[in-house]
């Protein structure tokens, strides 16, 4: 009899960034659920290109894909007043918080105690900042934010090879 695996919801922004995290989490014994929620992606055609690539990746790895509704107005509301903020500033923090909060809400609604994000694999994203946001939200929802720095051990190189 196969042992039941813990589930983890992996917020995914694109197939390039999620390839290695999906593989890593599966190898660590998790049943991965890819949660594609990205109202910040523009134009809409780019959003659907990324979603289609994520579908292909999830099919390849045999993991479930949950496609959240594409609603850019949620993003614009979250970052209202921060339009002039530089990259890596407060606007980015609000966007990360929006996407991780939606991921946590999905996890909680489906009785899944673990969640994380593929965003941290980017060499342009701040692991400590994303971890702080994830852990804050996890505490609010009584969940576990898996603070895994997927960049370590050539993770970014590996994810590019997978994609």
Regions found by a protein language model. Name each.
Residues 1-163:
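Nucleotide-activated chemistry modules centered on ATP-dependent adenylation/adenylyltransferase
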């Amino acid at each position: 009899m196969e042992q039941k695996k813990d589930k983890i919801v992996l917020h995914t922004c694109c197939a390039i960034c999620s390839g290695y995290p999906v593989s890593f989490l599966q190898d660590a014994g998790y049943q991965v659920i890819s949660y594609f929620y990205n109202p910040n992606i523009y134009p809409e055609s780019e959003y659907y290109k990324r979603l289609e690539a994520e579908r292909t990746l999830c099919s390849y790895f045999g993991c479930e894909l949950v496609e959240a509704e594409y609603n850019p107005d949620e993003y614009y509301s979250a970052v209202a007043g921060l339009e002039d903020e530089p990259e890596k500033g407060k606007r980015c923090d609000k966007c990360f918080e929006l996407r991780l909060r939606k991921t946590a809400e999905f996890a909680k609604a489906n009785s899944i105690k673990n969640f994380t994000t593929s965003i941290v694999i980017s060499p342009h994203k701040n692991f400590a900042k994303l971890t702080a946001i994830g852990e804050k939200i996890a505490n609010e929802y009584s969940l576990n934010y898996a603070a895994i720095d997927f960049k370590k051990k050539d993770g970014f190189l590996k994810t590019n090879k997978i994609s």
